[in-house]
């Protein structure tokens, strides 16, 4: 019986020195390099883009540079008084269950009063969010907003090479190119595919090859899983 390697869902590495720069994130990185000299009066920056474009990883680059505190929720005005940090990161920022509009209005006033800064990460620009509180709406529309687009080919190729290298896998350039041209263009998909391809290669006891990659990236993976379990798939 063929032993199947455990499916390990390794968390993405957000080490700041592992962040790879490219055309899609170049301007966002320039904004971070300009910190703390962000536009007054609130000195806040909104980086927005689709899921998996690298916003969270970029926030760790900012955290290392600024020592910012991660603020995961702000529901009540009374919480403002307990904020001891001056610089903040608000990841996955949405004005719903975790952040109330009234509390955020006072949060921006707090930033202006203390000379603090805030990095807000969201899928859409905060300037385009549906805000009922007019005073908060005006504040969100006054802060700098920078989009991160889906990664271009070169950036995605570099990221895939590094992900495989982190798993001690050396993968031919042609295989990387095939992946880039046949996958969804985001880092979340890249993490998932690399993990699945690594597992498939370990199961087959062979190095990562184009044949293995094609099998993993097939729309119907049921046949692949069945063959690996029964050890009768030639790769």
Locations of regions flagged by a protein language model:
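Conserved AAA+ ATPase "SRH/arginine-finger" region at the nucleotide-binding site
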Residues: 143-155
């Amino acid at each position: 019986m063929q032993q199947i390697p455990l499916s390990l869902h390794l968390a993405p590495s957000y080490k700041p020195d592992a962040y790879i720069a490219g055309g899609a994130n170049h301007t966002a990185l320039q904004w971070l390099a300009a910190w703390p000299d962000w536009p007054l009066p609130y000195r806040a920056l909104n980086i927005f883009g689709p899921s998996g474009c690298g916003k969270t990883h970029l926030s760790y680059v900012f955290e290392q540079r600024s020592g910012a505190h991660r603020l995961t929720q702000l529901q009540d005005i009374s919480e403002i008084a307990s904020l001891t940090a001056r610089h903040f990161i608000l990841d996955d920022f949405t004005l719903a269950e975790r952040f109330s509009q009234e509390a955020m209005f006072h949060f921006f006033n707090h930033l202006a009063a203390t000379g603090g800064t805030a990095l807000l990460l969201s899928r859409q620009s905060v300037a385009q969010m549906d805000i009922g509180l007019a005073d908060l709406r005006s504040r969100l529309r006054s802060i700098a907003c920078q989009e991160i687009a889906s990664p271009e080919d070169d950036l995605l190729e570099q990221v895939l090479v590094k992900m495989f290298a982190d798993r001690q896998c050396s993968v031919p350039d042609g295989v990387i190119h095939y992946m880039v041209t046949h996958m969804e263009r985001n880092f979340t998909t890249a993490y998932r595919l690399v993990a699945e391809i690594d597992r498939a290669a370990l199961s087959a006891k062979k190095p990562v090859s184009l044949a293995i990659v094609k099998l993993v990236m097939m729309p119907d993976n049921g046949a692949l899983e069945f063959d690996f379990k029964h050890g009768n798939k030639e790769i």
